[in-house]
């Protein structure tokens, strides 16, 4: 079984839905979908209600994901996303491959983005990119055959800084790199390398995602345990 097959099996199990990826899909695209599925799985495990919607707001169980960065509000294709609801806390949305506007006003590509659902609705109506201050978590997903180039970590550090809070950022890759580890440690950016199906690092990824959810819920529903 190929590594793409492993990723597909895992994400289908987590999402409980049909997906647009196949064995012919590029590994880096499927890896983004895999991280999306980990966000969904972590939300469910933490007690959230999760469902999926298409670009016009219809519920669906057939998921279409971007394979290149795009605008959250784009109507070019019927891209789908997840809606996550924890009790009375404001609803969240989870998207793959969208641009986010940093505090500097610069647009950044975000592989997997978790943001306030109200902000996402505003973006669709006003045709604007999500504001960093309204984003809960930005996940960088890197899939390489041998090692992660250092420039990828440097680029993400710039995004993380422009998000305004490095606790909102997570760097994830399927392989390791000593230089990337040292760099991200110095920058105080959360990271999990060697994160592939079956690896212990997956627990680390899900733990970091859960902490983001806990922070979100704690701001509005302190009695809700997740």
Language-model segments: which ranges?
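A short, surface-exposed helix-loop junction/capping segment
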Residues: 12-24
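Conserved catalytic cores of phosphodiester-cleaving nucleases, focusing on short active-site segments
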Residues: 39, 110-125, 132-148, 156
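Extracellular-facing segments of soluble proteins and assemblies that are Gly/Ser/Thr-biased and enriched
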Residues: 62-71, 105, 113-120, 134
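Nuclease catalytic cores
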Residues: 24-77
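N-terminal hydrophobic or amphipathic helices/low-complexity stretches enriched
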Residues: 1-15
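A recognition module on extended beta-rich or small alphabeta surfaces enriched in W/G with H and D/E
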Residues: 73-103, 107-113
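Catalytic core of pol beta-like nucleotidyltransferases
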Residues: 52-57, 95, 150-151, 158
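Domain-level recognition of nuclease-like catalytic cores that cleave nucleotide substrates
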Residues: 157-226
């Amino acid at each position: 079984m190929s590594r793409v097959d492993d990723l597909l099996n895992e994400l289908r199990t987590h999402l409980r839905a049909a997906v647009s990826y196949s064995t012919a899909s590029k590994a880096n695209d499927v890896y983004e979908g895999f991280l999306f599925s980990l966000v969904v799985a972590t939300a469910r495990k933490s007690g959230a209600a999760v469902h999926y919607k298409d670009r016009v707001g219809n519920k669906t169980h057939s998921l279409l994901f971007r394979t290149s960065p795009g605008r959250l509000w784009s109507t070019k294709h019927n891209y789908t996303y997840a809606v996550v609801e924890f009790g009375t806390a404001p609803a969240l949305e989870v998207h793959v491959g969208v641009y986010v506007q940093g505090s500097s006003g610069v647009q950044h590509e975000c592989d997997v983005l978790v943001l306030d659902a109200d902000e996402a609705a505003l973006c669709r109506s006003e045709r604007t990119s999500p504001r960093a201050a309204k984003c809960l978590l930005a996940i960088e997903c890197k899939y390489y055959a041998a090692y992660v180039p250092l420039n990828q970590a440097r680029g993400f550090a710039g995004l993380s800084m422009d998000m305004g809070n490095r606790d909102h950022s997570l760097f994830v890759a399927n392989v390791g790199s000593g230089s990337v580890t040292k760099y991200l440690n110095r920058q105080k950016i959360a990271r999990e390398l060697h994160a592939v199906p079956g690896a212990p690092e997956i627990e680390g990824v899900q733990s970091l995602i859960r902490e983001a959810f806990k922070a979100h819920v704690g701001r509005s529903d302190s009695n809700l345990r997740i």
